[in-house]
Amino acid sequence: MIKTLLIAPIRFYRFFLSPWIGRQCRFTPSCSAYAIEAIERHGALRGLWLASRRIGRCHPWSPGGLDPVPDPARPQQKNQGSGCCGNHSRTGLD
């Protein structure tokens, strides 16, 4: 429900205001498309954070270009990876 409430004004902008303003975004996908995808994929809080950061980067001095929404982080599995406390294996060189 919160996602729908956040996405509704973005869709309003895309369909009613954006045609009057013209394509101004320097990025692909556009900032409004990025915001919708970020909210749908990452949830309300993280999606808004990602969208806000993207809009902050969209200015006349930005080179723009391809900037897709990052993939959601997968939860780390216990005792996997290369942390200070993971993968304790003895090599016989102790």
Swiss-Prot record:
InterPro entries linked to this entry: Membr_insert_effic_factor_YidD
UniProt-annotated stretches for the region Disordered: 61-94
Superkingdom field: Bacteria
UniProt keyword Cell membrane present: yes
Keywords: Cell inner membrane, Cell membrane, Membrane
SMART domains, A to Z: Haemolytic
Subcellular localization, as worded in the UniProt entry: Cell inner membrane
Topology class, membrane: Peripheral membrane protein
One term under GO cellular component: plasma membrane
Family to which this protein belongs: Belongs to the UPF0161 family.
Summary of the function given for this chain in its UniProt record: Could be involved in insertion of integral membrane proteins into the membrane.
Name of the protein this chain belongs to: Putative membrane protein insertion efficiency factor
Species, as recorded: Bordetella avium (strain 197N)
